[in-house]
Amino acid sequence: MRGTLYIVAAPSGAGKSSIVNATLARDPKIALSISFTSRAPRPGERHAEHYHFVSAEEFQGMIEAGDFFEYALVHGDWKGTARQSVEPQLAAGHDVLLEIDWQGARQVRQKVPDAVSVFILPPSRQALDERMRKRGQDSEDVMAQRLAAAREEMLHFEEFDYVIINETFDTAVSEMCAIFTASRLRRQAQQQRHAGLIQALLD
């Protein structure tokens, strides 16, 4: 049985990474695909754990070689998912989660129409502003650009299957887990997973 591909996207500052990490800790059946990026590591980020950090030249070389499942220019830096991180795992029956932006999500849905997509929204613009400023990693000009980009990104929430409002962290994580559980209980998935049982019941 082929694995399920999950897509999680959100504007910067909505708490996407924290929710994803907490969800994966509760649901070990899903593997997180580590993205490639051309940007420099932020304080505390480690290569191959948070991102695969490569130069812009290396990233372009991977594009030309057709190595990416999806890629996009995000906030002036390249981000992408390697084919090798996704296709073999799905074919082997493993579930894979992509933590990407809406541009990458659009590309993925074109290639995998049955992918399950989730968009995370902040509870308010004020909360988004406060969360982004708490990072303390960007100048005021960069912060203004990120806030403007976040508002643009939120316009694309309608392209996703599910929407989570990250007002209370634990609730948001529980809702994400519920989405994964519901996905596994879809009729098509259950028919494949329990084909023998269903056949025996109906004979």
Curated annotation (Swiss-Prot):
Catalysis: reaction(s): GMP + ATP = GDP + ADP
Residue positions binding ATP: 10-17
Keyword Kinase: yes
UniProt subcellular location: Cytoplasm
UniProt GO cellular component terms: cytosol
First-tier enzyme category under EC: transferase
Pfam families per UniProt: Guanylate_kin (PF00625)
Alphabetized GO MF terms: ATP binding; guanylate kinase activity
Keywords assigned by UniProt, alphabetized: ATP-binding, Cytoplasm, Kinase, Nucleotide-binding, Transferase
EC numbers on record: 2.7.4.8
Domain Guanylate kinase-like: 3-181
Protein family (similarity comment): Belongs to the guanylate kinase family.
Main function: Essential for recycling GMP and indirectly, cGMP.
NCBIfam families in the cross-refs: guanyl_kin
The protein's name in its UniProt record: Guanylate kinase
Gene that encodes the chain: gmk
